């Protein structure tokens, strides 16, 4: 079954669309609050297809992510009980507990690390609000970390460019199914 090649082709097609920057910003914004798919899914192909615009794409992604993070912070700040209930329902309880302990231990530095962490960023934005972290240090640290991460991702993708995109396309089925198998294995390991 060849589904990853089709998805890859569609993503590359969307990355060249005239509204691609809008959708990249939108995905980045909602990912910082609740959306499960990271903006890298759009940032990488956009940076590969238009390497000279990679830095611009990274800035848009970071700004939208921070604005979304501010909304996540506000939700956490003003709706603590509701957030903790949703965290339980969505299966993020373990991530949440880890984020809370990190906030208690390291404060604002956690937001910086969160920009690069495999733990979903939305957990940290909501948690920062629940923990009532100082707002301006949160925003500044979030911007610096998100920009650093997205610049790194965009520049690496741009460096590979269209040549890398073509090579990646040839191996996308193997990569895609490998990720699925690893995710299933990780699920069963972490479940027990």
Swiss-Prot record:
Record-level GO cellular component terms: plasma membrane
Domain of life (superkingdom): Bacteria
InterPro entries, alphabetized: DedA_domain (IPR051311), VTT_dom (IPR032816)
Pfam families the UniProt entry points to: VTT_dom
Name of the protein in its database record: Uncharacterized protein HI_0703
Species this chain originates from: Haemophilus influenzae (strain ATCC 51907 / DSM 11121 / KW20 / Rd)
